[in-house]
Amino acid sequence: MFLEHREKEENKRQATAGYDLTDAYAQISYCLPGEPCPKTISLQADQEQYLIPALLGRYTDQDLWVYGPKAQAAAAAGEVFLVDGLLTKAAHQEMVEVGGQNYSSVALLSLFLKRTMSLLAPIVRPERLQALVFSVPEVSVPILSAVTDAVGMLGLKNASLFLIGRAESFFYYNICQPEELWKQDVLLCDFSGTFLHTLLFTANRKTSPVACFVEEADWKEVAAGREDLDQCFLETMKALIGDRNVSCVYLIGEGFLGEWYQESLRFLCQERRVFLGNNLYSKGACYAARQGMTCLLY
């Protein structure tokens, strides 16, 4: 990836959105005309509740669907048939049995996208978006096909649609931050799963244009539930960073809830900026939408 992307005409005069989608959660960020930075949709207006459970539920006694936390709560009460794993099921083109009826997994994914995109409506109607970028954990032909087909059912005729991986989303997020945050390497620690996943952003400023790289790695030994998790995370960070000049670290994912990583945090904060949050990927996708990408879904 090259920083010439940054020099393209941005879509600053139009509304854009970034949508991070996994089997577990969805998240939506948007940017309105003239605004410098994306904002993220929260399920609660007075809280930073950005993660939308990627769930659908159909009531057992009527043909009525709910999504997200409502589906989660209704399932706990035994009121709905719950459908999860929407992205993977759609990628596999599965037929999903719900309450004795079969449904297309792509159609179910499209329904979930429609319901979640409706959260944007009070701010900007989805059909008025200039560009919409989806960020997924891994880009593949089945995922591309599933998202393309599901989005195609939404009728977003005016929006340019894109699909990127999380590494590319991280790239766009970085280059849209103040340059002092990425003048050296940038590390992202993602603990949203059962083990740690890292992305390391580096920029070779000796080339023209500047060449940027994102190196991904899984650290399965840094797993949720370990009694010595702080020590294990600390040793992993020391090994990964080594003699690199890392100027900034992002900690994202529900695995970083609580205070279990105090020793690791003390190490990471030594001459580095450290940020804790969980909406980086959707913001990165939104920044990508503003940058005027070139690889369309359709």
Name each region found by the language model.
Residues 12, 18-25, 180-197, 202-204, ...:
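A short acidic Gly-Thr/Ser loop motif
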Residues 280, 287-298:
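Acidic, glycine/GT-rich loop-and beta-edge segments that sit at the periphery of enzyme/chaperone cores
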Residues 1-95, 152, 160-164, 169-172:
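Early-domain small/polar-rich strand-loop-helix modules and first-structured segments
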Residues 42-135, 218-239, 244-246:
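Conserved phosphate-binding loops in N-terminal lobes of ATP-dependent enzymes
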Residues 132-143, 238-265:
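Glycine-rich phosphate-binding loops at beta-strand->alpha-helix junctions
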Residues 134, 149-232:
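Small-residue (GG/TT-enriched) beta-loop-alpha framework at ligand/catalytic clefts
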Residues 156-169, 263-287:
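Conserved phosphate-binding/catalytic loops in two-lobed NTP-binding clefts
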Residues 28-29, 142-147, 172-175, 196-201, ...:
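A short acidic (Asp/Glu
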